[in-house]
């Protein structure tokens, strides 16, 4: 499927080495002021080729809005946009025409579809996530109307951990580090110099989300957020609130007691029973090391024969860095979708509207 969301949907298209990538946002309310400078600034945060901690593929990532915006305001029509691919080097992948890259989706996509684009992964390339970032930027323009903010940063790189998360630092950091930035940078560069890669974890928080978002059973807020984050290239695990640590606690430690003023703690991470509590929503995404590494590796070719190959091309030494920007975008899309879905959740809401 190429469409995400229920009430607010984002459909993406394009491949890594195709002419362009792009998206269509449907269900976006009319009357929202569209900030194209903010849109571009978000794309720039994810854009490749900006520094030595990302792939050297240098794309401008300029989004051209084709429809859905009139005189700077959303019109209620589908918002379509396109981002041209301008720095492909398809020859770097010619040696992969008959070979499955270890750790990539080459093998599984070929088994499913019987055909695959060997040039940088084609449709399944992380290049597509630029469209998600653009979609998330539009979602944030709507969230701004309600005082909702979403922030993400790199919490750890391998075994180097940030300590107390500092989102102000992350906003200024080349690698969006939440702390211990120099050690994280050093480890990323060490991996790159050794023709290897390294994993990372990303912390995301949502502030200002209203109480009551999410459906109680089959479209729970935490389940949809987890699915949105797991759908990002390279994410292997997602935690909400205490996450895995909750399995090590007693109920008396994990429960969030309440007073007249509200919750006394937030072990739940802002979600109970699949519905938002009004507290800060807290999520962690765990990214595997970039599977594209420049070491000799054994794999299979299309005939099922064992072969050895060495990768060429341009690749991120740590996908969690730019992945943190994508995580923010996906969370924005989910929160917007849930807010729009919630409008018809009870009679009082309907009477306010009609």
UniProtKB/Swiss-Prot annotation:
GO cellular component, one term: cytosol
Binding site residues for NADP(+): 46
One Pfam family from the record: Chorismate_synt
Keyword Protein biosynthesis carried by entry: no
PROSITE patterns named in the record: CHORISMATE_SYNTHASE_1, CHORISMATE_SYNTHASE_2
SUPFAM superfamilies from the UniProt entry: Chorismate synthase, AroC
Enzyme class: lyase
UniProt-recorded name of the protein: Chorismate synthase
């Amino acid at each position: 499927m190429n469409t995400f969301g229920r009430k607010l949907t984002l459909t993406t298209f394009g491949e890594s080495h195709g002419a362009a990538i792009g998206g269509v946002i449907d269900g976006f309310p009319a009357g929202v002021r569209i900030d194209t400078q903010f849109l571009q600034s978000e794309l720039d945060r994810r854009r490749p080729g900006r520094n030595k901690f990302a792939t050297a593929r240098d794309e401008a990532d300029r989004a051209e809005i084709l429809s859905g915006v009139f005189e700077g305001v959303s019109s209620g029509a589908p918002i379509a946009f396109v981002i041209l691919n301008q720095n492909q080097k398809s020859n770097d992948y010619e040696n992969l025409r008959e070979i499955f890259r270890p750790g990539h989706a080459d093998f599984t996509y070929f088994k499913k579809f019987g055909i695959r684009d060997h040039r940088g992964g084609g449709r399944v390339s992380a290049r597509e996530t630029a469209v998600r970032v653009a979609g998330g930027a539009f979602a944030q323009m709507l969230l701004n109307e309600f005082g909702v903010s979403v922030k993400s940063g790199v919490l750890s790189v391998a075994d180097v951990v940030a300590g107390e998360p500092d989102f102000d630092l992350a906003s200024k950091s080349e690698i969006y580090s939440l702390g211990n930035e120099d050690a994280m940078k050093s480890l990323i560069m060490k991996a790159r110099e050794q023709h290897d890669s390294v994993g990372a974890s990303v912390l995301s928080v949502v502030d200002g989300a209203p109480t009551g978002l999410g459906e109680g059973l089959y479209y729970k807020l935490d389940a949809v957020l987890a699915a949105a984050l797991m759908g990002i290239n390279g994410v292997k695990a997602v935690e909400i609130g205490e996450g895995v640590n909750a399995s090590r606690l007693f109920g008396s430690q994990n429960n969030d007691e309440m007073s007249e003023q509200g919750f006394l703690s937030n072990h739940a991470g802002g979600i109970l029973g699949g519905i938002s509590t009004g507290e800060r929503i807290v999520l962690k995404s765990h990214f595997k090391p970039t599977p594209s590494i420049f070491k000799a590796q054994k794999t299979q070719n299309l005939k099922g024969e064992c072969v050895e190959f060495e990768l060429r091309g341009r690749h991120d030494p740590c996908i969690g860095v730019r992945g943190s920007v994508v995580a923010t975008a996906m969370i924005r899309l989910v929160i917007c979708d849930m807010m729009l879905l919630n409008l018809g959740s009870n009679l009082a809401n309907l009477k306010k509207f009609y």
